[in-house]
From Swiss-Prot:
Function description: Cleaves thioester-linked long fatty acyl groups such as palmitate from modified cysteine residues in proteins or peptides.
Name of the protein described by the UniProt record: Palmitoyl-protein thioesterase 1
Record's signal peptide: 1-25
Additional comment: Flies deficient in Ppt1 are viable and fertile, but accumulate abnormal autofluorescent storage material in the adult central nervous system and have a shorter life span.
Family: Belongs to the palmitoyl-protein thioesterase family.
Coiled-coil segments on the chain, per record: none
Residues bearing attached sugar chains per UniProt: N240
A cellular component annotation (GO) from this entry: extracellular region
Organism: Drosophila melanogaster
Gene name of the record: Ppt1
InterPro entries: AB_hydrolase_fold (IPR029058), Palm_thioest (IPR002472)
GO molecular function: long-chain fatty acyl-CoA hydrolase activity; palmitoyl-(protein) hydrolase activity; serine hydrolase activity
Principal EC category: hydrolase
Catalytic activity: S-hexadecanoyl-L-cysteinyl-[protein] + H2O = L-cysteinyl-[protein] + hexadecanoate + H(+)
Organismal lineage: Eukaryota, Metazoa, Ecdysozoa, Arthropoda, Hexapoda
């Protein structure tokens, strides 16, 4: 009975969110802001799961903050599809490859971005923007900043620590057994970056997104060359994250193959060389930032101190 009540309550909250968002879409909704200061590079944002491009209390507030701190810089928050509902659904039900292709075309058509731009990805938007950097070098991305991105994927459920060990493990294994089925890969975004460290071959062969952008199927030199064109690749890990499991995936780390307890050092991972991260590391292009707090829990002061200076770079 409790779970049913919680489910109903969640549904009511979601419906209220959609109604509120639809109302806002006719009042304040704008995927672009600023543009009066040509001296700073434009900024592109990609929201995370369960969010949309422009809600005033979410990415809309981030847009306003960036415009303020860059004194009128152009900001584009990516909206997938033509309205708020499609944009929200994209976080769950539109395959990342389709979304990345759509975004690449949109960015190419935006004349504000022709000379380059900085990019900030929130949660899964982080690895989606990395795919843009790898697949679509024009217009050129300068600094890529990922806040809580899952660059090595996930192997756990949101808020799973609130469950006891047995049901948590059972649900996780149930998802894993179905995650790589073609119909699930096609239908559920999160399945495309579900990374089973115990059955690596199953992951590599079944993943239709993450295994590709991490060069785990074959070495795509085009991806390496494009990623290395970044001035900086900044990865922010939330040190008390209860959503992303393992949280170290935010720093491109993951479990050592064959188990799901011990984290392999970044420099010892296969992707470190296969994606050309070793060269970027040696040249100082990789930046690792840690922030105390749960998933995407950052303050305005922290953002201004740590992220804004990166957006002011040429």
């Amino acid at each position: 009975m409790i779970s049913i009540c919680c489910s109903r309550f969640s549904c009511i909250l979601f419906l209220l969110f959609l109604i509120f968002s639809l109302v806002l879409s006719y009042i304040w909704w704008s995927p672009t802001k600023g543009g009066t200061n040509p001296e700073v590079l434009p900024v592109v944002l990609w929201h995370g799961m369960g969010d949309t491009c422009c809600v005033p209390f979410s990415l809309g507030a981030i847009m306003n903050l960036i415009v303020e701190q860059t004194k009128g810089g152009y900001v584009r928050s990516l909206q997938i599809g033509g309205n708020v509902l499609i944009d929200w659904q994209s976080g769950f039900f539109i395959h990342p490859n389709e979304q990345v292709d759509y975004v690449c075309k949109q960015l190419l058509q935006d004349e504000h971005l022709a000379k380059g731009y900085h990019a900030i990805g929130f949660s899964q938007g982080g690895q989606f923007l990395r795919a843009v950097a790898e697949r679509c070098p024009n217009p050129p991305m300068r600094n890529l900043i990922t806040l809580g991105g899952q660059h090595q994927g996930i192997f756990g459920l949101p808020m799973c620590p609130t469950l006891t060990e047995k049901p948590c493990d059972y649900i996780t294994r149930l998802l894993d057994n179905a995650a790589y089925a073609p119909e699930v890969q096609k239908a559920l975004v999160q399945a495309t970056y579900w990374h089973d460290p115990i059955m690596e071959n199953k992951y590599r062969l079944g993943s239709t997104f993450l295994a590709d952008i991490n060069n785990e199927l074959f070495i795509n030199k085009f991806y390496i060359e494009n990623l290395q064109k970044l001035k900086k690749f900044v990865m922010v890990q939330f040190l008390n994250d209860t959503i992303v499991q393992p949280k170290e995936s935010q720093w491109f780390q993951y479990y050592t193959t064959g188990q799901n307890k011990v984290i392999q050092p970044f420099t010892e991972s296969k992707v470190y060389q296969d994606l050309g991260l070793d060269k970027m590391h040696r040249q100082g292009q990789l930046v690792f930032l840690g922030v105390e707090g749960d998933h995407l829990a950052i303050s305005k002061a922290w953002f201004i101190q740590n992220i804004v200076p990166l957006l002011l770079e040429k």
